[in-house]
Amino acid sequence: MIEHNPTTIYGTTIVTVRKDGKVVIAGDGQVSLGNTVMKGNARKVRRIGKGNVIAGFAGATADAFTLLERLEAKLEQYPDQLMRASVELTKDWRTDRYLRKLEAMMLVADSKVTLALTGTGDVLEPEQGVMAIGSGGNYALAAARALIETDKSAEEIARKAMNIAADICIYTNHNIIVESLDAQ
């Protein structure tokens, strides 16, 4: 878990759901500086590459943008190979002195795979089609897992999970941004 430094800007909860031919990443819009909400409508989920990859990030905002840019560069180097680009990014992240200090995590997805990327070099795939990161990640993950076997769509599950996380976590708000792709 990322420790909260009161002088660092944080962005918080991201959840991904893969179900019934869709993959969704949803995130809230709150950015906090210590105990203060600095912005309520930040966009922490976006399309990258040629629009065929969606990414969501949690952690220190500037660090997350740095990693997002690096992932886009890896996707240019390894087009249509999200797994390979992600592994190469995490190798750099783990071994580069500058990158190693970055405090952020990312969830990324394309039509074939969903991954969590961490600064410890982990590239993780979800077992049950759901993953979540950030300060409200555990709440969102529990909610999404509880709903994955229902008849709700991937987007409905992601939105409900984010709303539950926002009800519980003070670093997460109800301004939810959702991006989705068709999945295999």
From Swiss-Prot:
Look up the coiled coil feature and give its residue ranges. none
| Entry's transmembrane regions | none
Tell me which EC number(s) this protein carries: 3.4.25.2
User: Which residues are the active-site ones?
Assistant: 12
Q: Summarize where Na(+) binds, as residue positions.
A: 166, 169, 172
List where in the cell it is found. Answer: Cytoplasm
Q: Which UniProt keywords apply?
A: Allosteric enzyme, Cytoplasm, Hydrolase, Metal-binding, Protease, Sodium, Threonine protease
Principal subcellular localisation of the protein = cytoplasm
Q: What is this enzyme's catalytic activity, as reactions?
A: ATP-dependent cleavage of peptide bonds with broad specificity
Q: Which GO terms describe its cellular component?
A: HslUV protease complex; proteasome core complex
Which GO molecular function annotations are given, in alphabetical order?
A: metal ion binding; threonine-type endopeptidase activity
Give a yes or no for keyword Hydrolase in this entry. yes
One example of a Gene Ontology biological process annotation: proteolysis involved in protein catabolic process
- InterPro entries, sorted: ATP-dep_Prtase_HsIV_su (IPR022281), Ntn_hydrolases_N (IPR029055), Proteasome_sua/b (IPR001353), Proteasome_suB-type (IPR023333)
Q: How is its activity regulated?
A: Allosterically activated by HslU binding.
* Assembly description: A double ring-shaped homohexamer of HslV is capped on each side by a ring-shaped HslU homohexamer. The assembly of the HslU/HslV complex is dependent on binding of ATP.
Q: Family assignment?
A: Belongs to the peptidase T1B family. HslV subfamily.
Role: Protease subunit of a proteasome-like degradation complex believed to be a general protein degrading machinery.
PANTHER family found in the cross-reference section:
ATP-DEPENDENT PROTEASE SUBUNIT HSLV, METALLOPROTEASE TLDD
Quote the protein name from its UniProt record. Answer: ATP-dependent protease subunit HslV
Q: What organism is recorded for this protein?
A: Brucella melitensis biotype 1 (strain ATCC 23456 / CCUG 17765 / NCTC 10094 / 16M)
